[in-house]
Amino acid sequence: MSEYLLLLISTVLVNNFVLVKFLGLCPFMGVSSKLESAIGMSMATTFVLTLASILSYLVNQYLLLPFDLGYLRTMSFILVIAVVVQFTEMVVQKTSAALHRALGIYLPLITTNCAVLGVALLNVNEKHDFIQSAIYGFGAAVGFSLVLILFSAMRERLAAADVPEPFKGGAIAMITAGLMSLAFMGFTGLVK
């Protein structure tokens, strides 16, 4: 049980996919200007990352490995991710049309979010079992959500702050992301 807790903590804080592995930067920078959009994107990405991680494990274990089709791994994982994203988009559209409009193009772009594919491929490389794959996917999603929500809250405050003209917009956003990354480096010794 403690092994699973350590895996979750290390995935969320120590090996954060956005700040340490630099995966998922497109939605991180694109959706983080408003807190409401960031929360919606976080929920959608959490659902997609967790479910895609589980389904990718099952596809790998029960289709690719038994039939020696490892060379189709990346393509099959992208197909799994696309199906999960389409399902998520249909659910979001039915439950909250306002959220669907707020997320706009970023919801279908979860398909091309490298963090989702990265989690699926890293599960295979790390040789995680089913439960570890689910925890790793969920931990990556929680870490992504945590960073995205914190960053969007900071960007909203920065939009109202008196920032020098050369630093407005993307420049101050990148500086803030770098400072967040430094802050998360403080968790490095937390899990061995």
From Swiss-Prot:
**Biological process according to GO:** electron transport chain
The UniProt entry's GO CC annotations, sorted and at most eight, read: plasma membrane
| Chief place of localization | membrane
What are the subcellular locations of this protein?
Answer: Cell inner membrane
Task: Supply the Pfam families for this chain.
Answer: Rnf-Nqr
Q: Which family does it belong to?
A: Belongs to the NqrDE/RnfAE family.
Question: How the protein assembles, per its UniProt entry?
Answer: The complex is composed of six subunits: RnfA, RnfB, RnfC, RnfD, RnfE and RnfG.
Q: What is this protein called?
A: Ion-translocating oxidoreductase complex subunit A
